[in-house]
A protein has these predicted regions:
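Conserved catalytic-site region of short-chain dehydrogenase/reductase
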Residues: 22-32, 41, 71-75
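Catalytic helix-loop patch of NAD(P)-dependent Rossmann-fold dehydrogenases
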Residues: 29-65
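Glycine/proline-rich active-site loop of Rossmann-fold NAD(P)-dependent oxidoreductases
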Residues: 47-50, 59, 71-82, 112-123, ...
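Mid/C-terminal beta-alpha module of Rossmann-like enzyme folds, strongest
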Residues: 109-110, 116-159, 204-208
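Conserved C-terminal active-site "lid" loop/helix of NAD(P)H-dependent oxidoreductases
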Residues: 138, 158-181
Length: 209
């Protein structure tokens, strides 16, 4: 990221958008988090992301860092794929929050950030309503008539591939700064479209983000 930042400083670009991740937030108690709450990195990946953000942010006066939550839409969405394949499971009591954003809304945010030059800073891009695992699968079950996934124990933090977090990511800043209006304000609108797409014979299964 240092080499990229150095190149940006000499390239004279008018605006820069860097896509980061809401995984920089390591909170575990279901609390709301904003752009100022990523100050306690817990692992190598988070450290690398935060360092990259800072390097790019210092590359010029018109840099927007977009911290994206889990992206879904045509071709994306591993939990949806698991549900449709009958391999999904609800971890623990199902009350851990999921933060998601539709691909189209992410693209819209990128375009706005490029066009509205001068909105320098870090912004979360996520939908309006974090939902729990339980509510997500309950909605899918009720909408499709398929059975609910089984409950399984929470992953052991000491053996999990990545840190298990539980937080609700706020999108207030990006909406206020860019006037962003989500086409898919919650997962319901987005996955209703995905279910319609599959029902109309467009059977390309979603892939993992």
């Amino acid at each position: 990221s240092k080499h990229v930042a150095q190149w940006l400083k000499t390239a004279g670009t008018q605006s820069v958008v860097f896509i980061s991740s809401t995984s920089v937030y390591q909170q575990t108690n279901g609390e709301w988090v904003s752009e100022n709450d990523a100050d306690t990195p817990q692992n190598i990946t988070t450290n690398i992301l935060l360092e990259a953000e800072q390097n790019i942010l210092e590359a010029g006066p018109a840099v927007a860092i977009l911290r994206s939550s889990g992206i879904y839409g045509p071709g994306r969405g591993h939990l949806f794929r698991q549900f449709m394949n009958g391999t999904a499971a609800i971890e623990g009591d199902g009350k851990r929050f999921l933060n998601m954003v539709h691909l189209d809304d992410l693209v819209e945010a990128i375009i706005l950030a490029l066009e509205l030059v001068g909105r320098h800073g870090i912004y979360n891009i996520t939908d309006d309503e974090p939902g729990t695992q339980l509510n997500f699968f309950k909605w899918l079950s009720e909408t499709t008539g398929r059975p609910m996934p089984p409950f399984v124990p929470e992953p052991n933090p000491s053996t999990a591939k990545r840190r298990i977090t539980n937080k609700r990511v706020s999108n207030k800043l990006i909406k206020k700064t860019f006037g962003l209006l989500h086409n898919y304000p919650t997962f319901r609108e987005g996955f209703t479209q995905e279910l319609d797409r599959l029902a109309n014979g467009k059977t390309r299964q979603p892939l993992s983000p």
